[in-house]
């Protein structure tokens, strides 16, 4: 297994690449291939996510489908209770009470046009009530390892107790991306909802301008995932981007929307996302640190005529590093499971691990395997077993008992022999005196 470790972007790459100068409340750029963090800004701060909340809502719907509790083709009727309390000026697909849509169409309404009512309708369908669904949202967040997240609703309406972090959103989105339907829905630039019992067909245009050709922010490398905004949250965005062999995920929270001197409004969640992707594509590349058949050190061996075994990585170690990075600067630390390693050893046995670091920050960890098998020496194993036996408390106690018994038996034997000697002298002397009569 290769276990990539988190690496704080700006700190690690300082002096090696230029700072992209992101002025949002939080930002995170992660390499999906290795899990390494390329850029991080306040990634654990608790912030309002607005409609990024719907990523979790969508995840729970897709999981319910996988579990057989729901079907994409299943029809759902919008109830008055689901629509209750939704603001008229919020993002909507215009779904009305009594209207019937399939789960699939509700997902498109939820993720493409960010319809708040779609989130509430799906929540009620899955859990029986919106409140019960929110409980499941929080439980699922905890299961995913989110430590700075608490939801109060399935759509992202502002509440002081409704918050998350850039890192937690990464964890939630990562889980959602395991479902192919998630990207199918959220990467749609537009979608046409067929006519329903209460509406003619309607066309939904994605709120993410980075994936809509013809928009000023359009970037063909960017795909999905979700926008979010309200006055307290600012402008928020989660996306992925693929370029050459790179596959990245970006989270922006709390970006501004400002008007320039020409009167043009700029939404900086789009601007910073595009900036971070281009910065990463221009400045980073994958570099092979260790090949699978490379020697990665040696481990001392005991109980064998061979005194060491060569180690190799369990798999190739490939890291996303600044272009032109000096690989000699990487620190490789080997930790063995035992030192020395006892024979017999089978080729492929996990004997330890290697951590790869840069400037004290861990970039990756990989298991180290035995390159070859090593046979044990029977004589050395026997001698080891003998020494171990006599070093145990039980063996020492047994030896002590044996010595005590030997001493007791020896004492009895000596005492018995002395008594026999005295008895013999007494009997012999009396006989002689009786025979002499003068």
Question: Predicted regions: what is each one?
Answer:
Residues 1-8, 297, 323:
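Intrinsically disordered, low-complexity repeat and linker tracts
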Residues 3-167, 171-180:
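Active-site-adjacent loops and short helices of periplasmic peptidoglycan-processing enzymes
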């Amino acid at each position: 297994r290769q276990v990539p470790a988190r690496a704080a972007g700006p700190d690690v790459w300082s002096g090696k690449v230029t700072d992209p100068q992101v002025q949002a409340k939080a930002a995170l750029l992660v390499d999906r291939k290795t899990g390494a963090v390329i850029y991080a800004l306040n990634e654990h701060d608790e912030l309002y996510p607005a409609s990024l909340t719907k990523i979790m809502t969508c995840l729970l719907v897709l999981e319910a489908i996988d579990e057989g509790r729901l079907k994409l083709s299943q029809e759902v009727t919008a109830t008055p209770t689901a629509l209750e309390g939704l603001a008229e000026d919020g993002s909507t697909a215009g779904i009305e009470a009594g209207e019937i849509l399939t789960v699939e169409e509700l997902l498109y309404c939820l993720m493409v046009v960010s319809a708040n009512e779609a989130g509430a309708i799906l929540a009620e369908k899955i859990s029986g009530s919106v409140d019960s669904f929110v409980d499941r949202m929080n439980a699922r967040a905890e299961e995913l390892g989110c430590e700075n997240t608490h939801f109060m609703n399935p759509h992202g309406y502002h509440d002081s107790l409704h918050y998350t972090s850039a890192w937690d959103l990464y964890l939630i989105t990562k889980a959602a991306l395991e479902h192919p339907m998630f990207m199918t829905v959220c990467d749609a630039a537009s979608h046409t909802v067929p006519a329903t019992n209460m509406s003619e067909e309607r066309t939904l245009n994605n709120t993410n301008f980075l994936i809509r050709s013809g928009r000023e922010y359009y970037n063909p490398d960017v795909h999905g995932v979700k926008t979010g905004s309200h006055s307290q949250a600012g402008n928020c965005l989660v996306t992925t981007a693929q370029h050459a062999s790179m596959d990245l995920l970006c989270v922006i929270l709390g970006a501004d929307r400002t008007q320039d001197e020409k009167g043009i409004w700029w939404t900086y969640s789009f601007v910073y996302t595009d900036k971070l992707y281009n910065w990463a594509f221009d400045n980073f590349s994958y570099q092979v640190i260790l090949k699978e058949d490379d020697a990665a050190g040696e481990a001392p061996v005991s109980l064998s005529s061979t005194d060491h075994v060569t180690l190799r990585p369990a798999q190739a170690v490939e890291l996303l590093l600044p272009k032109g990075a000096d690989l000699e600067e990487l620190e490789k630390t080997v930790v063995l499971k035992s030192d020395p390693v006892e024979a017999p050893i089978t080729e492929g046995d996990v004997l330890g691990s290697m951590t790869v670091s840069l400037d004290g920050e861990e970039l990756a960890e990989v298991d180290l395997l035995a390159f070859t098998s090593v046979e044990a020496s029977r004589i050395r194993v026997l001698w080891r077993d003998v020494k171990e036996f006599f070093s145990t408390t039980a063996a020492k106690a047994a030896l002590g008992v044996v010595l005590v018994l030997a001493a007791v038996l020896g004492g009895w034997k000596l005492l018995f022999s002395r008594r026999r000697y005295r008895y013999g002298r007494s009997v012999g002397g009396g006989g002689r005196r009786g025979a002499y009569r003068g």
